[in-house]
Amino acid sequence: MQERIKACFTESIQTQIAAAEALPDAISRAAMTLVQSLLNGNKILCCGNGTSAANAQHFAASMINRFETERPSLPAIALNTDNVVLTAIANDRLHDEVYAKQVRALGHAGDVLLAISTRGNSRDIVKAVEAAVTRDMTIVALTGYDGGELAGLLGPQDVEIRIPSHRSARIQEMHMLTVNCLCDLIDNTLFPHQDD
């Protein structure tokens, strides 16, 4: 059991090292995309399923409340938090539309959709991205594996942050770290810390 525990930690560290080498440009582009949208008076819509839903909620909460330092609230909405809306849409046998309907209702040109999907193939996330495209929104996608169907929907203005792993647990861990990194970059760009 001890060796298995050490193997989990080692694999996680190796994935972080690989991501630290492969992803800085994509994360930087994503952060600047989010910052520019906020500076233009737009908002960020976020969605994901399971652990990805938790990451979407964490991002939105960090924007609305704060990340590590006090600052004004920033407009972000996690689309997976309203159980009444989600179950009303799903009850009409539109499971694939639970996020897309919200994107069409709430999204506007200049807004950003932060779409989080471990494999990039979740139908409801794919449909949300398709809806965002019709609303002239920019997409920031957090994926893993080969990026899945989601990667093929992205245009030149969009950003994919694809975790270099084929293990769901490692991808989800890196998605959380990436979300924290994005929050840090947004805060430090919009509200640079004053050195005392």
From Swiss-Prot:
The gene is diaA. The keyword Phosphoprotein does not apply. Residues 34-196 form the SIS domain. GO terms for cellular component: DnaA-DiaA complex. Changing L190 to A/P: Abolishes interaction with DnaA. Strongly reduces DnaA-dependent DNA synthesis. Required for the timely initiation of chromosomal replication via direct interactions with the DnaA initiator protein. Changing P72 to A/S: Strongly reduces affinity for DnaA. Reduces DnaA-dependent DNA synthesis. The keyword Glycoprotein does not apply. It comes from the Bacteria. One of its GO terms (molecular function) is protein homodimerization activity. Disulfide bonds: none annotated. CDD domains: SIS_GmhA. Keywords: DNA replication. Pfam families: SIS_2. Homotetramer; dimer of dimers. May be in a rapid association-dissociation equilibrium between homodimers and homotetramers. Formation of homotetramers is required for stimulation of replication. Interacts with DnaA. InterPro entries: DiaA, GmhA/DiaA, SIS_dom, SIS_dom_sf, SIS_GmhA/DiaA_subfam. Belongs to the SIS family. DiaA subfamily. Residues 190-191 are annotated as: Important for interaction with DnaA. PROSITE patterns: SIS (PS51464). This is DnaA initiator-associating protein DiaA. GO terms for biological process: carbohydrate derivative metabolic process; DNA replication; positive regulation of DNA-templated DNA replication initiation.
